[in-house]
């Protein structure tokens, strides 16, 4: 199985929907944490995160709390501390206060983090939700989502859905990805889809 590269999305600014607004002070606070993480100044980022969690958001189920929990997850994930990141991403989703598109971002981040610790059985239902919501509300479902679905199913020896999703990923890709094509070829051979394998072998 090819190595899956963890792709962490760190926003450069805080975006909010018309239904969810935060104060300028809070926006500056979150941006300050983003900047510390981006600069790899983890001590300062942790201080700000702990201050917010302990003094303002402990046990909170507000939009601001959800953003803080997501940031906490990013803080750990970008340092490859995936086990520590997982409960924070889970907590952000559990608030049920994220705008729909923001929740999609957290789902993908959480799915990647599950993958990195080998919890493939958790990746699949999470990304199924991601895909269903994306299709329902016309949000983009990138090739990377299908790739992660394919790798997770493959690790669980669920080769039919793994093959379906790697085909989706290859079809969506702007240019041929050699690793993806080779993985699709290996799955086609496992499933005895010899015609498909022949086509893939010429790409």
Q: What are these model-predicted stretches?
A:
Residues 35, 75, 113, 152, ...:
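Residue-level signature for tetratricopeptide repeat
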Residues 54-63, 94-102, 132-140, 173-175:
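Flexible helix-coil transition and linker loops at the boundaries of alpha-helical arrays
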């Amino acid at each position: 199985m090819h190595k899956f590269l963890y792709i962490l999305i760190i926003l450069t600014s805080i975006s909010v929907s018309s239904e969810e607004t935060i104060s300028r002070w809070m926006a500056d606070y979150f941006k300050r944490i983003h900047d510390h993480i981006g600069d790899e100044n983890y001590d300062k980022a942790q201080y700000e995160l702990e201050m917010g969690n302990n003094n303002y958001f402990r046990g909170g189920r507000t939009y601001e709390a959800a953003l803080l929990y997501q940031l906490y997850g990013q803080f750990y994930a970008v340092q490859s501390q995936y086990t520590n990141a997982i409960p924070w991403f889970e907590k952000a989703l559990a608030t049920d206060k994220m705008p729909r598109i923001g929740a999609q971002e957290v789902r993908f981040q959480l799915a990647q983090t599950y993958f990195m610790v080998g919890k493939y059985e958790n990746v699949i239902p999470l990304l199924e939700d991601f895909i269903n919501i994306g299709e329902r509300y016309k949000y983009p479902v990138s090739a990377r989502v299908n790739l992660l679905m394919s790798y997770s199913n493959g690790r669980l020896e669920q080769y039919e859905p793994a093959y379906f999703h790697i085909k989706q990923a290859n079809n969506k890709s702007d240019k041929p990805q050699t690793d993806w094509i080779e993985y699709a070829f290996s799955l086609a051979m496992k499933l005895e889809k010899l015609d498909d394998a022949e086509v893939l072998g010429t790409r």
